[in-house]
Design a protein with these regions (language model features):
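Short, glycine-anchored, charge-dense loop/turn motifs used at functional sites
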Residues: 10, 107-115, 245-252
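A charged helix-plus-loop insertion that forms the helical arch/lid used to bind
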Residues: 58-71
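Active-site catalytic loop in hydrolytic enzyme cores
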Residues: 67-70, 80, 96-203, 278-279
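Short beta-strand scaffold segments in enzyme catalytic cores
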Residues: 91-93, 104-107, 143, 242-244, ...
């Protein structure tokens, strides 16, 4: 079912992260309040915004910051903020459950309740994004939550590169697809991946006729060699460029590569639903022909 309010204003927060968790939560809250003041009802924060992107290095000390959703400082704070402002806030956090840790999102509804947790399905692993060292591949399956402002699906960063993520959430009835992100320049490659990154998600919007919201961080984050990280050195410049598309994949709001701030856009969910139905993309699917996708 679509949101019977027909239209909803959404926002993406773009921010730089620092060493202190409380400072990052404070900054994120200020941006959330700015977005709400502009009328936004669904507000997306970047991936793992409580900390710098620690996955640039392998350091066992970072396991200490993992927590359950109930214990997590950001989840607890934004549950209060969401209730106070009457907004929906997906919160990305480093989750601990028993002997496993996950890269997760807690979906907080406009009444402050936690509707559930999604755990990142696709976990990258290379010199600059060493996430397999920290995160177990998610076991929740893809999630779409019925919120006060529509049915919302969330994929986390690397999930956004896989069309299966978007299509599964579309089949589950998502009105919008949200992607909290931490991505930047790759020093070992003489390329700029930002346009490719954007086009990938614009394609998901167009192929499913569902709006997409992506929130990225900005700033350069350096890893200093030390005994705890086995003398690893790394540096990433996160290229921001957060954006919002309409249901056909057109950019309707975008941030630059380096500035902190909030972008907003009005989404007509009812019109998107009507357009989605008129195209027949889901009517004409042939799942019995897609067995290769499971191999």
């Amino acid at each position: 079912m679509v949101n019977m309010a027909n239209t909803v204003k959404v926002a993406a927060v773009q921010m730089a992260m620092h060493c202190n968790v409380e400072d990052n939560i404070f900054t994120a809250e200020n941006f959330v309040r700015q977005a709400a003041a502009k009328g936004a009802k669904v507000i997306l924060l970047p991936e793992l915004f409580e900390t710098k992107y620690f996955c640039q290095e392998r350091n066992y000390g970072y396991y200490k910051i993992a927590s359950t959703a109930e214990e997590n400082k950001a989840v607890r704070r934004f549950s209060q903020v969401a209730k106070s402002l009457g907004v929906v806030i997906p919160v990305s956090f480093f989750e601990r459950e028993k002997n496993n840790t996950y890269n997760s999102v807690a979906m907080i509804d406009a009444d402050g309740s936690i509707l559930g947790v999604y755990r990142k399905t696709h976990i990258p692993d290379d010199q600059f994004y060493q996430e397999k060292f920290y995160f177990t591949p998610g076991n929740t399956g893809f999630k779409v939550w019925k919120t006060a402002y529509g049915n919302i699906g969330v994929g986390i960063c690397w999930d956004q590169w896989f069309p299966e993520t978007a299509r599964c959430m579309a089949l589950m009835g998502a009105d919008m697809l949200l992607y909290p992100t931490a991505i930047g320049s790759e020093p070992i490659l003489d390329v700029d991946s930002m346009p490719h990154w954007r086009r990938c998600m614009q394609g998901h919007a167009a192929c499913n006729i569902i709006p997409v919201i992506a929130a990225n961080r900005v700033g350069t984050e350096d890893v200093i060699p030390c005994e705890e990280n086995a003398n690893q050195r790394s540096s990433l410049t996160f290229y921001g460029s957060s954006f919002i598309t309409d249901a056909c994949g057109e950019l309707i709001a975008e941030a630059d590569r380096s500035s902190e701030g909030v972008i907003t856009a009005e989404l007509d969910l009812s019109a998107a639903y009507d357009l989605r139905m008129s195209w027949g993309l889901f009517r004409d699917r042939r799942p019995e022909q897609y067995a290769m996708l499971t191999k």
